[in-house]
């Protein structure tokens, strides 16, 4: 057998083995989808999130107003969290979800200003006023290290303009669609545009 043919066959076998291993690994890993929905109440879908003192699911009459079969399917096949602690504003809650840390540990306890650091003269100097950064133990990075491809879609508001958290790709997402430092659209009907083009109707 000539060297060129032997080399080609060895490479083909090696590639086939690698693809087989990759396929087997992919089948062992479940897909992970996390929805973080702003201002959605525990009674705003047909999935009941209330529980009694023993942890049994309790349906509220308002749950009957909605028909959300896909959410029901996700809840039945996935994990539903019904006991948790949330901050009074979104930035600390979002940072806790991304890091798995309590707000007292990641030191984000206030809303992150989209345009600049919002620490006043009374704010603690050692506190985190700019949100997520690449040195924090964020779960998208852990997923990347485990071989996952990660994508962020929608509102991010992980950090202010100029900070690492401004771009979700800096904190572990391979792909970012729509996420930036802005925490809300320019207007409900987008008449002033979205995100960084707020106030610029021509765009």
What residues fall within each predicted segment?
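Formylglycine-dependent sulfatase
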Residues: 26-203
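Bacterial Sec-dependent N-terminal signal peptides
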Residues: 1-28
């Amino acid at each position: 057998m000539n060297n060129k043919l032997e080399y080609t066959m060895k490479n083909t076998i090696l590639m086939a083995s690698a693809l087989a291993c990759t396929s087997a690994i992919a089948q062992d890993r479940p897909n992970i989808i996390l929805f973080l929905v702003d201002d959605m109440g525990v009674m705003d879908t047909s999935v009941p999130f209330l529980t009694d003192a023993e942890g049994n699911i309790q349906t509220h009459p308002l749950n009957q107003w909605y028909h959300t079969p896909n959410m029901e399917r996700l809840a039945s096949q996935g994990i539903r969290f019904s006991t948790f602690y949330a901050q009074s504003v979104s930035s600390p809650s979002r940072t806790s979800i991304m890091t798995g840390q309590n707000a007292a540990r990641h030191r984000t306890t206030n809303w992150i200003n989209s345009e600049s650091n919002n620490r006043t003269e009374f704010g603690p100097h050692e506190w985190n006023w700019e949100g997520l950064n690449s040195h924090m133990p964020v779960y998208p990075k852990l997923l990347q290290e485990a071989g996952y491809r990660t994508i962020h879609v929608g509102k991010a508001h992980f950090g202010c303009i100029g900070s690492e958290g401004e771009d979700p790709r800096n904190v572990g997402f391979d792909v970012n669609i729509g996420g930036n430092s802005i925490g809300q659209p320019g207007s409900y009907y987008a008449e002033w545009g979205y995100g960084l083009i707020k106030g610029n109707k021509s765009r």
